[in-house]
């Protein structure tokens, strides 16, 4: 499964872990992805998304219908 948020498009990025002596060691910064079910009122069913915690907060604030239109539009553009 992909480690990409379906709403915010966050994905893993790499960087350096720094020790006290400032030695650099490569590491991955992985987004906080959860599987979450959302209730779609007009379709009367749940949908399941792999979404970051920031994406969950955005959906709670603005509504799931707005984000579904964005995701379907981006999927048509060969995401």
From Swiss-Prot:
One term under GO cellular component? ribonucleoprotein complex
TM region(s), chain numbering: none
Q: List the disulfide bonds.
A: none
Task: Supply the alphabetized keyword list.
Answer: Ribonucleoprotein, Ribosomal protein
One GO process term, biological-process aspect: translation
**InterPro entries found in the cross-reference section:** Bacterial_rp_bL28, Ribosomal_bL28, Ribosomal_bL28/bL31-like_sf, Ribosomal_bL28_bact-type, Ribosomal_bL28_sf
Q: Name one GO molecular function term.
A: structural constituent of ribosome
Question: Which protein family is it in?
Answer: Belongs to the bacterial ribosomal protein bL28 family.
The protein's matches in HAMAP family, at most eight in alphabetical order, are given as: Ribosomal_bL28
* Name the record gives this protein: Large ribosomal subunit protein bL28
């Amino acid at each position: 499964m992909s480690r990409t948020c379906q709403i915010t498009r966050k994905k893993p990025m790499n960087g350096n872990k720094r020790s006290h002596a400032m030695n650099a060691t490569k590491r991955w910064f992985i987004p906080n992805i959860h599987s979450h079910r959302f209730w779609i009122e007009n379709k009367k069913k749940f949908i399941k998304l792999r979404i970051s915690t920031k994406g969950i907060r955005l959906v709670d604030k603005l509504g799931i219908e707005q984000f579904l239109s964005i995701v379907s539009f981006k999927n048509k553009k060969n995401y």
